[in-house]
From Swiss-Prot:
One Gene Ontology CC term in the entry: cell surface
Residue ranges within the lipid bilayer that do not cross it: 345-375, 425-458
Lineage, top ranks: Eukaryota, Metazoa, Chordata, Craniata, Vertebrata
UniProt protein name: Excitatory amino acid transporter 2
Family matches, as PANTHER family: EXCITATORY AMINO ACID TRANSPORTER 2, SODIUM/DICARBOXYLATE SYMPORTER-RELATED
Subunit relationships: Homotrimer. Isoform 3 can oligomerize with isoform 1. Interacts with AJUBA.
Disease implication from the record: Developmental and epileptic encephalopathy 41: A form of epileptic encephalopathy, a heterogeneous group of severe early-onset epilepsies characterized by refractory seizures, neurodevelopmental impairment, and poor prognosis. Development is normal prior to seizure onset, after which cognitive and motor delays become apparent. DEE41 inheritance is autosomal dominant.
Residues that bear Phosphoserine: S3, S21, S25, S506, S521, S532, S534, S544, S560, S564
Lipidation (S-palmitoyl cysteine): C38
Amino acids binding Na(+) 2: T395
Cell compartment(s), UniProt: Cell membrane
Length: 574
């Protein structure tokens, strides 16, 4: 009877299961395309809001330009939320660089750190040279410069000449800061000053004539032979010395990694600090859509004569933009695919949030917290790689800047009717590469390093001011390419170093297992020792006395050796 009931119930159970599975499989097919799109956008809500903020800022800025002249205070208020965003991002740069470098390098041995650094530097220098050469080829092929533009744009502002030797020495000086606290907000720079120097007098004035001249209030006129002499000196300029901080904390992290368990407390501290900073990054990123929209809108409104500038420097802008698109959209993904054999476009989708943020903020260092989050959470790249490669890359890997500087230098030469020979073109390429390495990761740093290139090939430095009108757009685009280059570099270095990182992880696991075994063994020994001590008695009676029943009395100090045995009162001999 039971078997008959089981046989009758079996088809019902099977029928119900088939019915449930049928409903589950057919439901997604009938879902509307709009609902699926909304679900997709909901999962990437922050990215969607950021893209919407960029579009909204550009549209609102263009519409407000059509209105009557806007008061500067109104423009300032429109851009104010964007200014707050930049301040918050820059606020996190210092703790993020410190914590990321130390935590990343402390988990690696010296050999692994050296290999990671070597691979990163080879990638950085290779892509920067490729970008500079691409810029030279495009500007020579398109030839955007025309001597007639010089008459339309007018004369530029005179700039102080910069020596390549001084710039190189300043780079080395900043790499070794004399005061670590001062390096957080200042960096050293060689400054040239023009000083009036009078020739030495023919006759030395004695003390009497000097006193008489003072009593008579005689005014000595400056002799006509006075000469203008240029003197050099070192001065501290405002701005974080990122290069010096990176150099120090790289050494600090490697030294702490060599200490092993002795530095575990410090490693835990910086790990917690890094996690706290990343939590703050997530909070700030939900504010970024509004800040980026206000930044772009305010910048577009503040531009004067946008149409005239676009007409005069349109071909120059097109040359730079084409070069950035080719380098960031073709060359970098191609290098990533050749090395890793992985889809570069899915990788780019993972860093799209960082790319949009760089486009809005125009700062590689300001985008650094977002880049960390994209690579570690979206793409699953090892934190030891990102925390070492990204801070260094944000400082010295400037592919977009190298391309921009090469194009701008040759454009200025074409605008002045100067024909550069092969040697000068090579000089422009090499100088653009080296100057981009020394450029600080701050907005419009390319205009500062441009002085080095123009001085190296003997071009007028005052023409740099003519390019400032369009730098607001090109700065954002080259910064976004810089961030993309840093991200692809982290992915390539992680792919090449994955086996070594796995080996280090396995060694750490073996070490942890050994430590756990030792700890368990010590714990078991202590437990057995306590159990044996609790059962141990030290008999004070004579060997010939046999005690049938006894009571163990522990001494006040709790030691087993102080135990005594005494008979119960009713068992004692009378």
């Amino acid at each position: 009877m039971a078997s008959t009931e089981g046989a009758n119930n079996m088809p019902k159970q099977v029928e119900v299961r088939m019915h449930d599975s049928h409903l589950g499989s057919e439901e997604p097919k009938h879902r509307h395309l709009g609902l699926r799109l909304c679900d997709k956008l909901g999962k990437n809500l922050l990215l969607t809001l950021t893209v919407f903020g960029v579009i909204l800022g550009a549209v609102c800025g263009g519409l407000l330009r059509l209105a009557s002249p806007i008061h500067p205070d109104v423009v300032m208020l429109i851009a104010f939320p964007g200014d707050i965003l930049m301040r918050m991002l820059k606020m996190l740069i210092l703790p993020l660089i410190i914590s990321s470098l130390i935590t990343g390098l402390s988990g690696l041995d010296a050999k692994a750190s050296g290999r990671l650094g070597t691979r990163a530097m080879v990638y950085y220098m290779s892509t920067t040279i490729i970008a500079a050469v691409l810029g030279v080829i495009l500007v020579l092929a398109i030839h955007p410069g025309n001597p007639k533009l010089k008459k339309q744009l007018g004369p530029g502002k005179k700039n102080d000449e910069v020596s390549s030797l001084d710039a190189f020495l300043d780079l080395i000086r900043n790499l070794f800061p004399e005061n670590l606290v001062q390096a957080c907000f200042q960096q050293i720079q060689t400054v040239t000053k023009k000083v009036l120097v009078a020739p030495p007098p023919d006759e030395e004035a004695n003390a009497t004539s000097a006193v008489v001249s003072l009593l008579n209030e005689t005014v000595t006129e400056v002799p006509e032979e006075t000469k203008m002499v240029i003197k050099k000196g070192l001065e501290f300029k405002d701005g974080m010395n990122v290069l010096g901080l990176i150099g120090f904390f790289i050494a600090f992290g490697i030294a702490m990694g060599k200490m092993g368990d002795q530095a575990k407390l410090m490693v835990d501290f910086f790990n917690i600090l890094n996690e706290i900073v990343m939590k703050l990054v997530i909070m700030i990123m939900w504010y970024s859509p509004l800040g980026i929209a206000c930044l772009i809108c305010g910048k577009i409104i503040a531009i004067k004569d946008l149409e005239v500038v676009a007409r005069q420097l349109g071909m120059y802008m097109v040359t730079v933009i084409i070069g950035l698109i080719i380098h960031g959209g073709i060359f970098l993904p191609l290098i990533y695919f050749v090395v890793t054999r992985k889809n570069p476009f899915s990788f780019f989708a993972g860093i799209f949030q960082a790319w949009i943020t760089a486009l809005g903020t125009a700062s590689s260092a300001g985008t650094l917290p977002v880049t960390f989050r994209c690579l570690e959470e979206n793409l699953g790249i090892d934190k030891r790689v990102t925390r070492f490669v990204l801070p260094v890359g944000a400082t010295i890997n400037m592919d977009g800047t190298a391309l921009y500087e090469a194009v701008a230098a040759i454009f200025i030469a074409q605008m002045n009717g100067v024909v550069l020979d092969g040697g000068q073109i090579v000089t422009v390429s090499l100088t653009a590469t080296l100057a981009s390495v020394g450029a600080a990761s701050i907005p419009s740093a390319g205009l500062v390093t441009m002085l080095l290139i123009l001085t190296a090939v003997g071009l007028p430095t005052e023409d740099i001011s003519l390019l400032v009108a369009v730098d607001w757009l090109l700065d954002r685009m080259r910064t976004s390419v810089n961030v993309v280059g840093d991200s692809f570099g982290a992915g390539i270095v992680y792919h090449l170093s994955k086996s070594e990182l796995d080996t280090i992880d396995s060694q750490h696991r073996v070490h942890e297992d050994i430590e756990m075994t030792k700890t368990q063994s010590i714990y078991d020994d202590m437990k057995n020792h306590r159990e044996s001590n609790s059962n141990q008695c030290v008999y004070a009676a004579h060997n010939s006395v046999i005690v049938d029943e006894c009571k163990v009395t522990l001494a006040a100090n709790g030691k087993s050796a102080d135990c005594s045995v005494e008979e119960e009162p009713w068992k004692r001999e009378k």
